[in-house]
Amino acid sequence: MSTFTLDPRLHDETLGVSIQHQIAVIVDDLIGQLPDPARLTAEQRRGIIARYSAVLEGNFIYWMTAAYIAVKSEEVRPILAENLFEEIRDAHPVMLRKFTIAAHAFPSENDAMSVDRELTEVRLFLGKVQGVQSVLTMAFFECWIQRFMGFLADLASAQGSAEREYTDVHGVCDITHTAELFRALQLEMAVNPIGPDANLFEGVDLLRKLIIAIVHGPAENTAA
């Protein structure tokens, strides 16, 4: 299992590019760790879908709202509001629930509790209402989600499901969302810079650990 030393101490003139590069490296590593769906048991496939659903259905809108509350830039708020508008208007949680049920992977209490510690840490981080760090965390998550959708669809297919609305929509729309959130990050940093001792990647690292728990189960995350 690869680990990262997340370095927030970047030069101003290359800050945006450097941050996006670091995020791309982290996402590439997470995608590279994904198991082959064909080598997984039905229960392992079900568990990944169930843990993903247990986290995403009730938390994504909450997390994006937390970022909206945290930011100071008036230019950033419409970017986050547009993301939330799409989530609510198009009922993305309904899409996810349909996808999960069709794959016979509706989360159990055990599924939810298996990621509870990592999920709680992300929630507590967002409760600090730090604009820059919150936006970066959501940019990272959108970047990972759009890369993860093909794998998630393959898991569902192996479970006998043909339901694809959720994975098809997010495999496309989250590309735009990622780009917009990185633009929002630069706008927020211009008016609400973080302090010299702040960890820019605090939320990213916590969310990375949650993703590992979703994909590999909580035992795997102890070594991450």
Predicted feature descriptions by range:
Residues 2-224:
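Non-heme di-metal
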